Amino acid sequence: MGLNPPFDKEGIYIVDGKLHVIGPRYIAMVANALANETRARILRYIAKKPADLDELSHIVGQSKANISSQIRKLENVNIVKAKYVPGTRGIRKVVELNVNQIIFHIADPEKK
């Protein structure tokens, strides 16, 4: 039984707040982004509420530069999204979840 569009080819798709991951390359990319304790802690925290880099740095106990790098890896696979908002001292980068569920499609999308 094949998958319906947009799931008829490999890639990363967001549908109704769910991240659908299809194909070995993309599964490995998303799994790699999730396979880090710091990134897991960030995800658990922002699942409750969006947070800026200062807040995440304090919660996780790492530098803002490292947090920014970790966020970029999660952004690259569409798990989180960041926006820039005015703060009391300039612009703040606020991070929030982009999806509420991740689904790995193991079967070959071209099999019918």
Predicted region positions:
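Alpha-helical residues within the helix-turn-helix
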Residues: H58, E75-N76
